[in-house]
Amino acid sequence: RYWFADPFLFERDGITYLFFEAFDLVECKGKEAYSILCEDGTWSSLKVIIDEKYHLSFPNIFEYGGKMYIMPEMSEDYSLKLYEAVSFPDEWKITQDILSDVYACDSVFIEKEGVQYLLTNEMYHNVPNGQYASCWVKNYLYPMKGLKVTGDGVKVADGDYGIRNAGKTFISDSKLYRIGQDCRERLYGRGMVLFEITSLNPYKEKKVKNWSCEEIAKHIRSNHHGKIIGSHTYNFSEHYEVIDFSSFQTLSRRIEILRKWHNTKRNIYRILGFVKRCCY
């Protein structure tokens, strides 16, 4: 009934949670769901936790001020809302409207040295050069305080190469990084691009590395026969990293836990390779 995408990991009290989009093939829309890593290495049955009348994806989960939040993608509603856990991880409520009248997708929360920003991708209604709306986007940076937007957004980039977010931002060796999607050739998630954010005000970033689907496929253990045609979300936690992919063989989307990390002080991240011990 479902295929899966947009995985986010969260570890709490010794339990590893995997939050993801569960696309319901019967209802033709995405829902937010989670699964728990069991002691034998398997995953519990999925549980849907947020189901709206419109499509949901990219369940960006994070902790702030001792509370748990999810900031999903809900572009079909032309809004961006923040959900707060009433009873983690099963019960959630809308706690505020972050943005309205926006065609926004895959938004990430940035906090560095006490300063907060929202970096969101806004899709075009009239896409240039025959591109797909999901591929060609504009990046807007909004100032925030206490998880509330405090000013107008500033467009910082647009295009199809690395502009659309592909996971959370993270800090490594005091450097702030963003991972984006390579959507060139009118292909959604053709690869991934890593950027270092060198300045937030004004916003500046520089490309560090990029990976094609073929390169990403080398790190995925599932029996995909090298026929991966898309990968567009990558995240990690203290002990795990996770990635989604679609394959030509099955025309389905899957989530892959790449490896469990036993020594977190190594250069541990298989996809990011050179990046040392990281945190959000």
Locate the predicted segments by residue.
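Carbohydrate-active catalytic/glycan-binding domains of CAZyme proteins
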Residues: 1-280
